[in-house]
From Swiss-Prot:
EC number(s) stated in the UniProt entry for this protein: 3.6.4.13
Protein name, as recorded: ATP-dependent RNA helicase DeaD
Positions of transmembrane segments: none
Residues making up the signal peptide according to the UniProt record: none
Subcellular localization, as worded in the UniProt entry: Cytoplasm
Taxonomy of the source species: Bacteria, Pseudomonadati, Pseudomonadota, Gammaproteobacteria, Enterobacterales
Domain Helicase ATP-binding: 37-208
Length: 629
C-alpha cells in the first residue's frame, strides 16, 4: 500500500493561502509545518525546536495569516527576529504567502532604516509587523506601534536573540502585549533563559521537535570570500571572469537584488537573467529553458524562486547573499555537481555575517576555506587564455586562405614602408580584444584587511593554566596593555540620558566589530561622554558611529584629538566593570573571565597582536579562486 502524503489542504488551510503556495512552488508540507500548522490554526501556543531552514517561517506564517482579520487595519501579528536580514526575509515570505488575501499588508521594522519611512508604513495600518527587538522597543517607547489588537506573537530564532543580548528587550516587549494572544516560539536550542520565557509568557505550549536533515556535499568544492575592498557586484564580476564555468546560479536574498545583480552583469557583458517570485509561470519556464539549452549562462535567483530547479549545466553556485541557515546553504550548492559532474560553490561573507558562516561550518562539520579576490594579474592571465582558445579555434577553420590573401591588400601608411606581420598581428589583436582589454591595469593599493573577532574562535582555556595567583598585596598593579596610540572622541550621550559604560562599550564593540580591549578610558558627564579609541579610525567607521544610537539617542561621535598618555593601572569608567563591579582584566561580552583582556579583536589598522594564534588553520595560505587548489 502506498504511503499517504499529507498536503497543505489536509492541514486545513484555505483557498487564498493554498493558491499562494501553489504559485511559490510548495508541493507538500515539511515535518515542522505538518506538526505546527494544525496546532496554531486551533489557537494553541507552540514551542518549536528545529534548526533554521526547516521551513518554520511557513509553519507559523500560514496559520496566523489564516486567523487574522483583513478588515482590521491594526497590527495583529508581531514577529521578532534577531537580525534585520532575517526580518526582511520573513516579511517578504509573509507578503508572498498573503498575496491572494485582499487588504493584508506587511511592514518590516529594523535598525539602519529611517524612522520616517517606517512611520509612513505604520500609518497605513499593516496587520503584520516583523522587526528586530531594538527597533520594535523604540517604536513602543515612542508610541508609534500599537499592539492592543495583537492576536499572534512569534519569536523566531529565540536562542540567537539570547546570544546577541536581546533577551531583555524581548521580555520587555512581551510584557507590554495584552493577554489573550497566541504565542509561537522557535529555537534551535533551549537554554534556561528561553525556558524562563516559555514559563512566564506561554500557556501550556505544544512542543514540536524536528531533527535536522543537513548533509554535506564532498563532491562540491566550497570556498568563501570576506567582502572587503570593493562592492559585491564588482567582486562578483571578477570571480565570474576568473572561474571557468558552463552555467552559474547566483543566489540573493530579495527580489530587488535579483534585478540589480542581473543588470550589473548585463552591463559587463554577461548573458544573465533574474528569477524571482514576481515572474509568472510562463516566463519562469521560458527562462529555465534558455538556461538549459545554452542561450542563457547565469541565473540570479531567490531561494523560493529556485525551488525545484534542476539544470545539469550549472557548474558554479555563488551565494551572493549568505543564507540565514545551513539547510538553505546545502540546498543552494546542491544545484551544482549534478549528474556526476564536479561543482564549485562560492560564498560572500560580510563581517557582520561571520556567525552565519560559523553556523554553516558547525552544522556541516567542515571548515570552508577562504579565497582571495582575483587580482589584475590573474584576470589578465584568464583573458589571454580565453582569447588564445578563440584564436586556436579559428586556426582550425577551413577558410583561412581567403583571409591570408587579404593580408597583402593591407598597405602600410607610409609609402615604401614594409609590412611587418608581427606589428600587424599586434594591431589586429588590440582591435579584437573587445571591451575586456587583454592588458589589465594593476590594482590600486587597498587598505590592509581588518581582522575581526569571532567569539567562537577562542579556544577553550583551563583555569589551572593561569598559574598561582599569590597574595593580592604581593602582585603588582595591572598595567594597561599597549594597544598603540589612542585618540579621544566625544559622544552626545551622558548620565542624564541614563547611559552607563556598558551601553557605550556594547555599542562600539557590536556596531564597529571592535574588540573591547581596544576601547580605552570612558568618562561619563552629564550631557556627553568621552571615549578613547585606536588612532586611524577609517572615515566610514566614524560616520557609522555618528548615526549609531545608544538608548535611542544618536552618538554623534566627534574627534577631539590625541588622547593623553596614562599611567599603569588606570581603569575605564572609574575602575568598575560593566555591572559596576571592580574588574581584574575584565570580562568578555559572553561573561567569561578574560585574564589580561584576552581576545582577538582588530585594530583599525588591521594589525594582529603578536603571539596570537591565527583564527583558523591557515597553514596552506588562502587559495586563489579559479586557481589550483
Amino acid at each position: 500500500m502506498a504511503e499517504f502524503e499529507t498536503t497543505f489542504a489536509d492541514l486545513g488551510l484555505k483557498a487564498p493561502i493554498l493558491e499562494a503556495l501553489n504559485d511559490l512552488g510548495y508541493e507538500k508540507p515539511s515535518p515542522i509545518q505538518a506538526e505546527c500548522i494544525p496546532h496554531l490554526l486551533n489557537g494553541r501556543d507552540v514551542l518549536g525546536m528545529a534548526q533554521t531552514g526547516s521551513g518554520k517561517t511557513a509553519a507559523f506564517s500560514l496559520p496566523l495569516l489564516q486567523n487574522l482579520d483583513p478588515e482590521l487595519k491594526a497590527p495583529q501579528i508581531l514577529v521578532l527576529a534577531p537580525t534585520r536580514e532575517l526580518a526582511v526575509q520573513v516579511a517578504e515570505a509573509m507578503t508572498d504567502f498573503s498575496k491572494h488575501m485582499r487588504g493584508v499588508n506587511v511592514v518590516a521594522l529594523y535598525g539602519g532604516q529611517r524612522y520616517d519611512v517606517q512611520l509612513r508604513a505604520l500609518r497605513q495600518g499593516p496587520q503584520i509587523v516583523v522587526g528586530t527587538p531594538g527597533r520594535l522597543l523604540d517604536h513602543l517607547k515612542r508610541g508609534t506601534l500599537d499592539l492592543s489588537k495583537l492576536s499572534g506573537l512569534v519569536l523566531d530564532e529565540a536562542d540567537e536573540m539570547l546570544r546577541m543580548g536581546f533577551i531583555e528587550d524581548v521580555e520587555t516587549i512581551m510584557a507590554q502585549i495584552p493577554e489573550g494572544h497566541q504565542t509561537a516560539l522557535f529555537s534551535a536550542t533551549m537554554p534556561e533563559a528561553i525556558r524562563r520565557i516559555t514559563r512566564r509568557f506561554m500557556k501550556e505550549p505544544q512542543e514540536v521537535r524536528i531533527q535536522s536533515s543537513v548533509t554535506t556535499r564532498p563532491d562540491i568544492s566550497q570556498s568563501y570570500w570576506t567582502v572587503w575592498g570593493m562592492r559585491k557586484n564588482e567582486a562578483l564580476v571578477r570571480f565570474l571572469e576568473a572561474e571557468d564555468f558552463d552555467a552559474a546560479i547566483i543566489f540573493v536574498r530579495t527580489k530587488n537584488a535579483t534585478l540589480e545583480v542581473a543588470e550589473a552583469l548585463e552591463r559587463n557583458g554577461y548573458n544573465s537573467a533574474a528569477l524571482n517570485g514576481d515572474m509568472n509561470q510562463a516566463l519562469r519556464e521560458q527562462t529555465l529553458e534558455r538556461l538549459k539549452d545554452g542561450r542563457l549562462d547565469i541565473l540570479i535567483a531567490t531561494d523560493v524562486a529556485a525551488r525545484g530547479l534542476d539544470v545539469e549545466r550549472i557548474s558554479l553556485v555563488v551565494n551572493y547573499d549568505i543564507p540565514m541557515d545551513s539547510e538553505s546553504y546545502v540546498h543552494r550548492i546542491g544545484r551544482t555537481g549534478r549528474a556526476g559532474r564536479a561543482g564549485r560553490a562560492l560564498l560572500f561573507v560580510e563581517n557582520r555575517e561571520r556567525r552565519l558562516l560559523r553556523n554553516i561550518e558547525r552544522t556541516m562539520k567542515l571548515t570552508i576555506p577562504e579565497v582571495e579576490l582575483p587580482n589584475a594579474e590573474l584576470l589578465g592571465k584568464r583573458r589571454l587564455e580565453k582569447f588564445a582558445a578563440k584564436v586556436q579555434q579559428q586556426l582550425e577553420s577551413s577558410d583561412l586562405d581567403q583571409y591570408r590573401a587579404l593580408l597583402s591588400k593591407i598597405q602600410p601608411t607610409a609609402e615604401g614602408e614594409e609590412l611587418d606581420l608581427e606589428t600587424l598581428a599586434a594591431a589586429l589583436l588590440k582591435m579584437a580584444q573587445g571591451e575586456r582589454t587583454l592588458i589589465v591595469p594593476p590594482d590600486a593599493p587597498m587598505r590592509p584587511k581588518r581582522e575581526f573577532r569571532d567569539r567562537d574562535d577562542r579556544g577553550p582555556r583551563d583555569r589551572n593554566d593561569r598559574g598561582p595567583r599569590g597574595d593580592r598585596e604581593d602582585r603588582p598593579r595591572r598595567e594597561r596593555r599597549d594597544v598603540g596610540d589612542m585618540q579621544l572622541y566625544r559622544i552626545e550621550v551622558g548620565r542624564d540620558d541614563g547611559v552607563e559604560v556598558r551601553h557605550i562599550v556594547g555599542a562600539i564593540a557590536n556596531e564597529g566589530d571592535i574588540s573591547s580591549r581596544y576601547i580605552g578610558n570612558i568618562k561619563l558627564f552629564a550631557s556627553h561622554s568621552t571615549i578613547e579609541l585606536p588612532k586611524g579610525m577609517p572615515g566610514e567607521v566614524l560616520q557609522h558611529f555618528t548615526r549609531t544610537r545608544i538608548l535611542n539617542k544618536p552618538m554623534n561621535m566627534q574627534l577631539l584629538g590625541d588622547a593623553q598618555p596614562h599611567t599603569g593601572g588606570e581603569r575605564r569608567g572609574g575602575g568598575r566593570g560593566f555591572g559596576g563591579e571592580r574588574r581584574e582584566g575584565g570580562r568578555n561580552f559572553s561573561g567569561e573571565r578574560r585574564e589580561g583582556g584576552r581576545g582577538d579583536g582588530r585594530r583599525f589598522s588591521g594589525e594582529r597582536r603578536e603571539g596570537r594564534a591565527p583564527r583558523r588553520d591557515d597553514s596552506t595560505g588562502r587559495r586563489r579562486f579559479g586557481g589550483d587548489a
